[in-house]
């Protein structure tokens, strides 16, 4: 899943961290390990990268709805510092679907401690619109 050069899970992008995502029935799961290049406060992941991981993860998790879309809002709560160089576990669920709006929740866990959580609103776009966007990208 994803694009080859995506900065978060693109296999050909040198800044992409080890990141895997899979869907099991109605729950999305992920694993990521962020190294020193993602450091914010000492020995912890920069909050911007935490948000980016959530955006990518929930963007794929919304495939559960059958109507994937683009990010409308992403509200992140930081519970504890997210450590570097530790396997992070991600869990994502669909909270609600209202017409074209997909609302999902996500959590990041490190060593059995939840470090961050979020809620994302994604707006479904048609396959035709998606292809138009892709074509404009070149």
Regions inferred by a protein language model and the residue ranges of each:
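Active-site helix/loop of acyl-thioester processing domains in fatty-acid/polyketide metabolism
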Residues: 22-27, 45-68
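Short histidine-centered catalytic/ligand-binding loop motif
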Residues: 34-48
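HotDog/MaoC-like acyl-thioester-processing domains
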Residues: 82-84, 95-138
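Hydrophobic beta-strand-centered segment that forms part of the acyl-chain substrate-binding groove
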Residues: 56-89
């Amino acid at each position: 899943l994803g694009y080859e050069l995506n900065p978060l899970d693109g296999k050909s992008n040198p800044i992409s961290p080890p990141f895997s995502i899979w869907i099991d029935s109605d729950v999305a799961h992920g694993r990521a390990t962020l190294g020193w290049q993602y450091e914010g406060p000492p020995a912890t992941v920069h909050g911007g990268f935490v948000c980016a991981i959530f955006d990518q993860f929930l963007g794929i998790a919304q495939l559960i709805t059958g109507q994937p879309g683009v990010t409308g809002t992403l509200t992140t709560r930081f519970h504890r510092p997210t450590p570097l160089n530790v396997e992070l576990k991600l869990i994502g669920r669909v909270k609600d679907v209202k017409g074209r709006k997909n609302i999902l929740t996500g959590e990041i866990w490190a060593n059995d401690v939840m470090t961050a959580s979020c809620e994302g609103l994604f707006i479904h776009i048609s396959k035709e619109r998606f292809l138009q966007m892709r074509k404009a990208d070149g």
